[in-house]
Amino acid sequence: MSDRTTLRRKPDRAIDNCQAIHALIDEAVYCHVGVMAGDGTDAHPVVIPMLHARHGDRLLLHGSPASRLLRTARDGMDLCVTITLLDALVLARSGLHHSMNYRSVVVMGRATEITDHDEKVEALDRFVEHAIPGRTVRIRPATTQEVKGTLVLSVPLDDCSMKARTGPPIDDETDMDSDTWAGLIPLHQGVGIPIPDEATGDATVPGHVAFWSRGRR
């Protein structure tokens, strides 16, 4: 953590725990990556959602070498990655005190490109396993051309912070006599029934697909 990732608004909600930060990164399916693109008066912020993965204390990103965002990050530009999971809507007795229960991580830093073939293959497998655990052993390996045609970046998790809100609404004491309903609406990510493509047909759905889940168990 550095001065730029130190919480100033509601610092009591900070979670200074690497294990908790890693767990949130692993639980979330995707992140948002932001950079400043362009030069001079043409400079402008760009934020793109991306699938991510984690390898130890590094965050992995990947995509097409033609991606402006990834090329900008590869060239040494500072980037900002955010990951947020919503756990509940918080309904209070006044509009001002409505809120959300959430867990959020902010990562800042500079990315380095992974160019070694074997390291890239390992990273690409991590993306698949992050999204669908148990999948890599059931699909063909990436071809040399596919590996060459993918840009993989690694971002250190040295400069990051986590913030979370939990619990019920916090109302003004003067509103507590109101008959307005207040409390929480829990939120979770729903998972539908797997839909096979035409070539798969009526084949049995494998366990890693049928029992895919995300979040706290």
Give the predicted meaning of each segment.
Residues 1-3, 115, 119-217:
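C-terminal edge-of-domain segments
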Residues 29, 48, 55-57, 75-79, ...:
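A generic structural signal for short beta-strands and their flanking turns/coil linkers
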Residues 35-37, 63, 83-85, 111-113, ...:
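Short, structured patches in soluble enzyme cores that scaffold and shape functional sites
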Residues 65-126:
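Short, structured beta-strand-loop surface elements
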Residues 2-61, 71:
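An N-terminal domain-cap segment
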Residues 35-42, 69, 92-97, 140-142:
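Catalytic micro-motifs at enzyme active sites that drive phosphoryl/nucleotidyl and oxygen chemistry
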Residues 59-62, 81, 105-107, 153-154, ...:
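Short hydrophobic-aromatic micro-motifs
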